[in-house]
Design a protein with these regions (language model features):
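Short, Lys/Arg-rich, polar N-terminal cytosolic tail immediately upstream
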Residues: 1-9
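Membrane-water interface of alpha-helical transmembrane segments
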Residues: 8, 14-17, 44, 48-51, ...
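Alpha-helical transmembrane segments
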Residues: 10-28, 88-94, 166-172
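Alpha-helical transmembrane segments in multi-pass membrane proteins
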Residues: 16-69, 115-124, 132
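C-terminal TM-helix exit segments that contain a strictly Trp-centered aromatic cap at the helix terminus
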Residues: 25-32, 97-106, 176
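Juxtamembrane helix-loop-helix connectors linking adjacent transmembrane helices
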Residues: 39-46, 71-141, 183
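Structural signal for the C-terminal ends of transmembrane alpha-helices
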Residues: 63-73, 207-210
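Transmembrane helix-loop-helix hairpins at the membrane interface
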Residues: 99-103, 128-229
């Protein structure tokens, strides 16, 4: 079984940060920052709230996992050829599988757009604060999500079951990107979006599993988001 490269302290930090990202921020993030803004005497809009949380999480993840990130950087540079090959293969498979799934959903349910790209670029925040939103989508979110979901959770679960590692992280990744949009109205449309988000979830997990460097799925995730924006 491949080593997760994680210390016990990093695993504890990963649990806490993942719970903050998956539960605390979606449920209470707006209320917390609105309360803080009230104390300081100014209003914090949705775009600024997103930026603040992403910066805070980025800093926390970098601090908690700095040793792990350094180890993965060594793996990347030590096997540069394999690393770049994995990155290229991941991008090819992402767009190939995404196109296949798009055509299948179009054939079965008649959708005429790529749901993955639509879910990403139709965010109201992109119009409200384009620079901050692009920074979050292309830099901050890929770093945070890949370190927490792939580096921490996938790496930890892989020590016990590779199949469980793929399954759990793919489901979490898909739900993370659809649940907030769907709210209480999780219709077929959002189920199809979740299925399409399972594609990058699978590809990014494979990229980390094959390269053993978290920088590869981070780069792949950033590239996919940049092209979608």
């Amino acid at each position: 079984t491949r080593d997760s490269h994680l210390t016990d302290l990093e695993k504890l930090g990963g649990v806490i940060l993942l719970l903050i990202y998956l539960a605390l921020i979606p449920l209470c993030g707006a209320a917390i920052l609105n309360w803080a803004g009230g104390l300081l005497g100014f209003s914090i809009g949705p775009a600024l709230r997103q930026t603040i949380w992403f910066y805070l999480l980025f800093a926390a993840v970098a601090l908690v996992f700095h040793r792990f990130l350094f180890v993965c950087a060594g793996t990347f540079t030590g096997s540069a050829g394999r690393s770049f090959q994995t990155l290229g293969t991941a991008l090819i498979f992402f767009y190939g599988l995404n196109e296949i799934l798009f055509r299948v959903t179009h054939l079965l349910w008649g959708h005429t757009v790529n749901l993955n790209d639509t879910a990403l670029v139709s965010l109201d925040l992109l119009n409200a604060a384009p620079a901050a939103t692009v920074l979050a989508l292309v830099v901050l979110a890929p770093f945070i999500e890949e370190v927490l979901l792939r580096g921490f959770l996938f790496g930890w679960l892989r020590q016990h079951s590779r199949a469980a590692a793929y399954l759990v992280t793919c489901i979490l990744f898909a739900l993370l990107h659809t649940w907030a949009m769907a709210g209480d109205h999780f219709t077929l449309y959002y189920l199809l979006i979740a299925l399409q988000y399972a594609v990058p979830g699978l590809i990014f997990a494979w990229a980390y599993d094959r390269s053993d460097s978290i920088w590869i799925p981070i780069a792949a995730h950033a590239a996919v988001n940049a092209l979608a924006v």
